[in-house]
Amino acid sequence: MKIIEYEDKYLEEVKDLLVELEEYILSIDEDNLDQLHPEYRDKMAILDLEEVKENNGKCYLAIDNNVVVGLIMGCLRSYDEYDYLDYKCPRCGEVTELIVSKKTRSKGIGSLLMNKMEEYFKSIGCEYITIDVFAYNKIGINFYEKQ
């Protein structure tokens, strides 16, 4: 198992993992607000990777036997004018995507990915890390509470 920075040769596997993540979210979405748009697979990875690049972020991949089994994406959080009016706005990293393939969960891969992203955020002076998790994502909430 190794954690590496994203390389373009893994784009198709990243697309597959993001679809797996969205399918999971759809399966637990109590409000039925999520959807898997026909263009999701082809566009979401590109949009996520552009966001990472534009916002001083990183994408790390967990590789096992030359197969991508997990990924994490994170960026430097941006603030708008409203934020500055009522918030101190510390330098903050934001985890935007985290998925470990269902076949390889419960092996510590998610923690390895989080640790790698935490190292990166610390290296660029972030004081905090944020992540948004749907309230109905009990597995995700449980994972982050352990971190």
Mark where each language-model region is.
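A short beta-loop-alpha structural element at the N-terminal edge
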Residues: 2-28
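Conserved GNAT-fold acetyl-CoA-binding loop/helix
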Residues: 23-47
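Conserved active-site alpha-helix within GNAT-family acetyltransferase domains
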Residues: 111, 123, 135-147
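Conserved acetyl-CoA-binding loop-helix of GNAT-fold acetyltransferases
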Residues: 97-100, 106-119, 145-146
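Conserved acetyl-CoA binding element of GNAT-fold acetyltransferases
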Residues: 83-102, 132
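Conserved GNAT acetyl-CoA-binding A-motif
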Residues: 114, 121-132
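A short helix-loop-beta-strand connector motif used in the catalytic cores of GNAT acetyltransferases and
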Residues: 46-61, 94
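Conserved beta-strand in the GNAT
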Residues: 61, 67-76, 94, 99
